[in-house]
Amino acid sequence: MVKRSLLVLALLICLPATLFAQYDYVRISNPFLHKIPIAVPLFQALTGTEPEVKAAQSGADLLADTLEFTRYFNLINRAAFLERPDRTGVTLADIDCKNWRDIGAEFLITGGVTVAGGMMEMELRLFDVFKERMILGKKYKGKPVDQRKMIRRFCAEVMEQLTGTPGIFESRIAFISTGDGSKEIYACEFDGYNPQRITRNSSINLSPAWSSDGQWLAYTSYRKGGPDLYITHLTENRGTVFSKEGINIAPSWVPGQFMLAATLSFEGDQEIYLLTGSGTVVRRLTRSWGIDVSPTFSPDGKRMAFVSGRAGSPQIFIMDMGSGRTQRLTFEGGYNTNPSWNPVNDTIAYCAMTGGAFNVRVIDVKTGATVALTADQGDNESPSWSPDGSLIAFSSTREAGVSRIYVMTAAGTDPRRLLILPGEQTGPKWSPAVAAGR
């Protein structure tokens, strides 16, 4: 659990709420997004000590990299700056906004760092260089090792001011890695930083799924021989093992509830059931002769998409959780799996077999219109949305046929490898906006 007592946050200047209402929020799901031009000069070491100079450099670089990862900020190259790094002011009175407008910036972030007595203070400000005013000012205090947390939190504040959502900066991504020869579940921060091992049983562990509050992780493990469900609290030593005869696989949490769906076969056929988070079967959800797997829920939890073989091949269906009425969603192609419902709207990312390879597509639930996001780069599978719906994590064999995890925009642009780890990495699952274990 994050020890928030180590990190103290104070507002530098209180601004009237009406000031922020004048900004038009950026639509982060817009595939034709005009990236926001922003400048992040080196921070100022306020007393000039060596630890401050190092912290100022690393802090500015980390903040720029963090914003750039979102794909909707255009970071102005520091080589284009008209001001010398050591003369860039921290407050509005010390800033020549024209110098920043002339190089194409619309916004400017400045920072000042103090390191003394084993503690760090960081002042961060966001300015609109066209309106020549400060939008946001924050002061953070903590240990030097807390610098990344300070930067993450400020980036969330910047995002909320400019887009209306705090973004992804406190989210995590769970995944499967074979680095030690077995399939273990790991979790890292949204940008691949700090990968941590979750399971340690030298067995096969699959299908990690986050609860809505980011505190619980459900997954399938073969540690006792057969596929059982494990429901584990990430910061406390407690949880549940769900083990019925047959298979117990593919968990998915119901949004806003301590309940999940999973595929079980204790009654013979592989059907989807609703369970409590403590492992009690509530009711059976599907009833068909074909295998039903891979449940995923709409943002309000009122509908469930899943994969079924009832049509003769794997296709995605949608069930109304109230009435039980089910309708087929995918019709194009003979193999469609791995559905992931966008947490903010009615689109579903999924994996389709096209041209002998697996590729990621997105389908509009209302219209049935599909868009291909990957093609001609190996197998691309297991898509998972970021909590704000702006990015998609997925696994791909595009590099030498070895499965790695990548992140791309919701429009399929700007794919980047997330992690550099031994072995293969598969099955990414993005957490809600805030997740435990950071």
From Swiss-Prot:
GO terms for cellular component: periplasmic space. Its main location: periplasm. SUPFAM superfamilies: TolB, N-terminal domain, Tricorn protease N-terminal domain. The keyword Transferase does not apply. Keywords: Cell cycle, Cell division, Periplasm, Signal. GO terms for biological process: cell division; protein import. Residues 1-21 form the signal peptide. Transmembrane segments: none annotated. It is found in: Periplasm. Part of the Tol-Pal system, which plays a role in outer membrane invagination during cell division and is important for maintaining outer membrane integrity. The Tol-Pal system is composed of five core proteins: the inner membrane proteins TolA, TolQ and TolR, the periplasmic protein TolB and the outer membrane protein Pal. They form a network linking the inner and outer membranes and the peptidoglycan layer. Belongs to the TolB family. This is Tol-Pal system protein TolB. It comes from Desulfosudis oleivorans (strain DSM 6200 / JCM 39069 / Hxd3) (Desulfococcus oleovorans). The gene is tolB.
